[in-house]
Regions:
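Cytosolic-side transmembrane-helix boundaries in multi-pass membrane proteins
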Residues: 1-29, 204, 211-218, 292-325
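Transmembrane helix-bundle core of multi-pass membrane transporters
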Residues: 126-192, 219-222, 241-250, 301
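Transmembrane alpha-helical segments in multi-pass inner-membrane proteins
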Residues: 231, 241-307
Length: 325
């Protein structure tokens, strides 16, 4: 094992990431062997990618928040709120699709600003404010849409159907390219810029950063703003893949996004984050969901399995930190 760790390729890519990719491949093979025709390769890959498109943006966003030592349980309902309100504006007020997409991102930005302000400047615990935002997002979406589901245009729509090309164009996974490009940008921000380094330092030792003269409130708030923007983008890709959105939903994606993030190597106590690991973790969670559905398990069983994954990932993280210390 020590020789493997010293391998230049392994050191460059990271042993944990390589193991995650191996787990992803083995999981896919296992599902195919066990399920057979119930798990068709082409359809399974397409369904997994549709899940990755939106869940990936949620996981990337919450990676920034967790890196500061915070948490955000509102990302799923906020994503639905973004999609519902912007879609309602398009269907009821004939707002152009491009403008509706901008509204999506702006709503996510507003929630990110609100959460960041309350955590950073009002000293409200992240858990409390994120739970409050979750209910606020559900309430606003229900009131605005009169508790009605909202459907975005189909690809056949001659005026607004073009936005679906962001997900897939003639079978080519455009959404995957966009997601990976955004992940690269997130990695550059987190590892190669001053704001990113401050965000990571906040999770490691917030008090030491404050005593060194850094405005910790500003940088903590920035992490939540980035998260909100990415959630807004995720809403666009959700409706691009699934069309219809219903008020009152979205909670189930909180744990899945956090599970992908933590499974990828981001520490729940902050200070350590892996964008590359998050990307792989999202693929694993998305593939797992497709496998669970192919087995015929219900939503309740899916939530139980996702919750157990979070527990195991956090336990592994805590154990690793104890060994280091």
């Amino acid at each position: 094992m020590e020789k493997l760790k010293q391998n230049p390729i392994v050191k460059k890519l990271g042993l944990n990431r390589i193991l995650l990719v191996c787990n992803l491949v083995l999981m896919f093979v296992d599902f195919k062997v066990v399920l057979g025709s119930k798990f068709p390769v082409g359809d399974s890959i397409k369904s997994t990618l549709n899940y990755v498109y939106f869940l990936g943006f949620l996981s990337l966003g919450v990676t920034f928040v967790i890196a500061t030592g915070g948490i955000d349980f509102s990302i799923g309902p906020v994503m639905f709120c973004c999609a519902l309100i912007s879609g309602y504006c398009m269907t009821s007020y004939h707002v152009p699709c491009a403008a509706a997409m901008v509204i999506c991102v702006l709503i996510g930005f507003a929630f990110g600003m609100f959460n960041g302000w309350m955590v950073s400047y009002m000293s409200v615990p992240p858990f409390i404010i994120s739970m409050a935002s979750m209910n606020i997002a559900k309430g606003i979406a229900s009131v605005f849409t009169k508790t009605q589901s909202v459907s975005w245009p189909l690809g056949s729509d001659p005026v607004n159907g073009w936005f679906r090309n962001l997900v897939s164009y003639k079978g080519f996974p455009v959404g995957l390219v966009i997601f990976l490009a955004v992940a690269v940008v997130c990695g550059i921000i987190l590892y190669n810029t001053k704001p990113g380094r401050y965000i990571l330092c906040l999770g490691s030792n917030s008090e030491a950063v404050r005593l060194s003269g850094v405005n910790t409130k500003k940088w903590r708030m920035l992490a939540y703003v980035i998260c909100g923007i990415l959630v807004g983008i995720g809403a666009i890709f959700f409706v691009g893949a699934y069309t219809t959105v219903q008020p009152g939903y979205g909670d189930q994606y909180n744990n899945e996004a956090i599970a992908g993030c933590v499974m990828g190597g981001t520490s729940m106590v902050g200070g350590l984050a892996s964008i590359g690991g998050t990307v792989i973790g999202v693929f694993i969670i998305s593939l797992l969901q497709q496998g669970i559905m192919a087995f015929g398990l219900g939503k309740g069983q899916q939530m139980i399995i996702t919750g157990l994954i979070v527990i195991v990932a956090v336990y592994v993280d805590v154990s690793a930190r104890r060994r280091k210390n």
